[in-house]
């Protein structure tokens, strides 16, 4: 946010209050302008429709938005289904789901941790 980026959270959680509890415990609630939970929307990532409220809210073309997530088959494929870029956090790269999808779903960028995100985003317009 300090660098001018607007942040929203899209979660596949089945229980909306649980998402807020976890965010409060991690002191992350204030980082996000809006939070969308599949339990409320009725669709889960990778379905493109879970991204539609965020696209409407931020009022930007999908090509100007990116999904940052650690699951290729949900987060990155979902971003692509919605016309967005996908940035893969590789901390869970060895999970069976990610191993299965590694050769089929290609993110626009990969980072090992969220600490790498600000430098990546500073150069993002030049990379796209």
What are these regions (language model features)?
Residues 5-6, 10-128:
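Asp-based, Mg2+/Mn2+-dependent phosphohydrolase catalytic module
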């Amino acid at each position: 946010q300090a660098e001018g980026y607007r942040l929203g959270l899209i979660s596949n959680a089945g229980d909306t209050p649980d998402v807020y509890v976890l965010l409060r415990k991690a002191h992350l609630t204030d980082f996000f302008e809006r939070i969308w939970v599949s339990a409320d929307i009725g669709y889960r990532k990778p379905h493109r429709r879970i991204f539609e409220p965020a696209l409407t809210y931020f009022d930007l073309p999908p090509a100007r938005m990116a999904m940052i997530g650690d699951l290729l088959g949900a987060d990155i494929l979902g971003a692509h289904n919605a016309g967005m870029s996908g940035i893969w956090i590789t901390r869970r790269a060895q999970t069976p789901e990610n191993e299965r999808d590694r050769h089929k779903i290609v993110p626009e960028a990969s980072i090992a941790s969220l600490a790498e995100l600000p430098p990546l985003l500073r150069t993002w317009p030049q990379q796209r």
